[in-house]
Amino acid sequence: MSLSIFAAAREAPHAEALVCDGERSTFSALAERVQARRAELDALGVQPLDPRPLALIVDGSPAMFEYLYLCFELGVPLLPLHPRLTAPERAYLIRACGAQLTIEPSQSEPAVNRDAKPWAWPKVPESRPLALVPSSGSTGHPKLVELSRRAFLALARADAQRVPPRVSDRALLCLPLSHVGGLSVVTRSLAARRCCVAFRAGSTGLLGSVPELAQSLIDERISLLSLVPAVLARLLRKTPALAAHAPLRAILLGGQACSAELFAAARERSLPVLTSYGLTETCSQVSTLAFPPPLAAPLKNGVVSVGFPLEGVDVRIVNGLIQVRGPTLFSGYVGGGDAPFDAQGFFHTGDRGEFDPELGLFVFGRNSELVITGGENVDPSEVEHALLACAGIEAAVVFGIPDPEFGEQVAVALELSAGRALDERALFEQLDQRLASFKQPRALCVFDALPRLGSGKLDRARVRAQAAAQLRPIARGPRASR
């Protein structure tokens, strides 16, 4: 296995590699366009094996894939940036890793091979970082997780052992490429030399584009699909007979917990759902349900099992918390900080869980305040920082509340500055400039004074308990989840 579009072009030149915006490309044709982009980056000073990352706005366009594969060939670390990030969010990530250049594919010219310069291509060591992927941190800003080529290749090999590949397999990419879940769909497809079909959601996000998503599954004969449970739930409602029309072999569910009801509904409709558990730091997967999936969900206390660890991955439970070790682990956080691994090489996830030798791993929730909404990780402290920068906000506590569709929604309890009244419209106009929409609160309440501890710190537990009866939904438009 390799993550080289050139190697794929040699091994399967005429096989379809990419379907994007109506364009169909073989591995050979795609490799030619990637090579044509080399002169462009060379003129901008990007050199092979350059340790400085290249920031790429991952808009899902054909040009974006060309830059993506070119970074893989050059051994230049990739910083994937979500198109919906605000300017301050984008600037922070670029500064944090010292990215040398930001590419916006939507502003690029088509790739044309205007010269026949015989470029020298490096042999890229597997230890080299392939991507720096944003993940929620505890400082009010995302952490950047360094993932090596070795980690992505280890995941591709383990995935092929869990779900044996077929020559006819076609994978649909509908997850954001700024997340490791989306990026790993691309790397697994490239490593397996299979076609990746890129689906671009409309302005209402993936949840608002479910009918089009279902049609793509059918039209493109998709066999492999990765989703968050919220999207699967809507797919079941909109297209209950999907299994009769699309040749789906495996639907990998991740990003949030899958309910027993959703699993049962999917299996009743003959959809091959594989629950999974993973983190950005584990290259998206730690464990996955056995393939083919059972008809009934393996349950413990109403929680659906996420199966057994992937090949080469070790999982242990210490004091009720999940720890992970294996070749898919990240190399560390950009900028260092606390050592992420213990003396035995285990990464402490902070997630509560239990391992059953017959039923597999069960994940019971996080030991932190992280909110996971529709598969998106939201750090409450980041949202609180943004709120405190808004006029009239004295204090804020952000937390997650249960939501039947998204798993959780972001909620906030506010304390206003003296003499100020809440202007909801003005508040969210300010938040629109600071936070992506999925990070913004969907429910709120206002306290005269938020409960505090004797030290003066906010008493987050009391705030949550007292806010429960006071929260009201925020009247905003339909949420674009992804």
Residue ranges and their predicted role:
Residues 13-14, 117-134, 141, 146, ...:
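Conserved pre-ATP/AMP-binding loop-to-beta segment of ANL
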Residues 14-46, 55, 61, 88-91, ...:
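Conserved AMP-binding/adenylate-forming core of the ANL superfamily
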Residues 23, 40-85, 377:
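Conserved AMP-binding/adenylate-forming
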Residues 26-28, 130-157:
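Conserved AMP-binding A3 loop
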Residues 153-170, 178-224, 238:
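Conserved AMP-binding/adenylation subdomain of ANL enzymes
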Residues 222-227, 233-300:
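Gly/Ser/Thr-rich phosphate-binding loop
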Residues 305-312, 316-344, 376-378:
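Conserved ATP/PPi-binding loop(s) of AMP-dependent carboxylate-activating enzymes
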Residues 326, 352-439, 456:
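AMP-binding/adenylate-forming catalytic core of the ANL superfamily
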